[in-house]
């Protein structure tokens, strides 16, 4: 059995007060992000660091990021290729243990991670709690999956996998992609969304602290059209996991379709793009509850999530009343 992650009861004054205390301590904290590589990275001019601001308060600087250079990309690829064989040969129990330790670290630092999520990506407390918990659950889920495989099951790693994650769930989806690739014996180069590199740096540092070798998981913050394009076109990338727009997914699809793996197989692309989600309401539903659920689903996180409500289907007998209440 896999234990569920711990959370916060925001209706309880005591944990809420503790969270507010942490938030006040970190209110003016400036986080930093830069390439995190298996080899020593190139020296970055701090004067070129890019400010990351709070999307809910643009005047508030949350941190700074030094985006990866072309040289950083090459160093990361070289380090990953060198680490491929040893990580693939690492026992699955040890790979799973690394993920579980990383989950424990995230859970222990949930308050700090929540505050950073609120400041860097505009999360509410409730959404920040849910995001950290989802990241923890992803790590433990994939660890448990590999542990429960039959002893004679063969899991053949691809090699080095590129993980490109979105800004709307910059810790949960970021961690889920990486966890799935790592536990299967792959090395990972993670390219976070350019808007949210700070939380990504924290996650990679926790994975390192949990025992994942530096060359096995690396971080390359930067733009999709530069860092992402250079990585996706490189023959050393043997798989891509992407969450984002359909437009970019199609570009990646065309890119990987131009080449094959060393053994002649297509390069896997796992792409999660936008959703078209419907809520179907029958005539027995409580109209007041439907309105609350529809508004929350459509507009929570400003509607910027793949699971957000797009289409509301209602029974003709109740449509007029429901639409009036929605308005």
Regions found by a protein language model. Name each.
Residues 1-78, 82-85, 89-108, 115-116, ...:
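Terminal low-complexity tails and localization/encapsulation signals of metabolic enzymes
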Residues 54-56, 65-69, 115-121, 129-132, ...:
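Active-site proximal loops enriched in glycine and acidic residues that flank catalytic Cys/His/Asp
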Residues 76-86, 101-105, 109-112, 116-120, ...:
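Generic, well-ordered alpha-helical scaffold segments in large soluble proteins
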Residues 148-214, 288:
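Conserved small-residue-rich beta-alpha loop and adjacent elements
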Residues 151, 218-241:
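A structured beta-alpha segment of the ubiquitous adenosine-cofactor-binding alpha/beta core
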Residues 161, 185, 217, 237-240, ...:
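Structural signal for hydrophobic
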Residues 161, 168, 224-230, 246-249:
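Beta-loop-alpha module in the N-terminal Rossmann-like domain of NAD(P)-dependent dehydrogenases
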Residues 209-211, 233-234, 239, 246-327:
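ALDH superfamily catalytic-core signature
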């Amino acid at each position: 059995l896999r234990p569920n992650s711990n959370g916060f009861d925001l209706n309880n004054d005591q944990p809420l007060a503790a969270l507010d205390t942490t938030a006040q301590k970190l209110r003016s904290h400036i986080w930093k992000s830069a390439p995190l590589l298996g080899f020593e990275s190139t020296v970055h001019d701090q004067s070129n660091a890019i400010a990351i601001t709070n999307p809910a308060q643009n005047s508030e600087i949350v941190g700074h990021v030094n985006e990866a250079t072309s040289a950083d990309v090459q160093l990361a690829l070289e380090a990953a290729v060198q680490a491929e064989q040893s990580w693939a040969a690492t026992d699955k129990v040890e790979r799973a243990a690394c993920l579980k330790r990383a989950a424990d670290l995230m859970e222990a630092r949930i308050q700090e991670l929540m505050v950073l999520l609120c400041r860097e990506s505009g999360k509410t407390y409730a959404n920040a709690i849910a995001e950290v918990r989802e990241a923890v659950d992803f790590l433990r889920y994939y660890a448990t999956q590999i542990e429960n495989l039959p002893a004679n099951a063969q899991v053949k790693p691809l090699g080095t996998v590129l993980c490109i994650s979105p800004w709307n769930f910059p810790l949960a989806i970021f961690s889920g992609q990486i966890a799935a690739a790592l536990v299967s014996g792959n090395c990972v180069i993670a390219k976070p969304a350019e808007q949210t590199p700070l939380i990504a740096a924290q996650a990679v540092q926790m994975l390192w602290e949990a025992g994942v070798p530096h060359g096995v998981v690396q971080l390359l913050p930067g733009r999709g059209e530069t860092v992402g394009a250079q990585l996706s076109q490189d023959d050393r990338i043997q798989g891509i996991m992407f969450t984002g727009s359909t437009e970019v997914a199609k570009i990646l699809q065309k890119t990987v379709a131009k080449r094959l793996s060393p053994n002649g197989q297509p390069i896997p692309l796992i792409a999660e793009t936008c959703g078209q989600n419907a809520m179907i309401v029958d005539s027995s539903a409580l109209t007041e509850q439907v309105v609350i659920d529809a508004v929350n689903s459509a507009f929570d996180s400003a509607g910027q999530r793949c699971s957000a409500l797009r289409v509301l289907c209602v029974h003709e007998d109740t449509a007029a009343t429901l639409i009036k209440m929605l308005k």
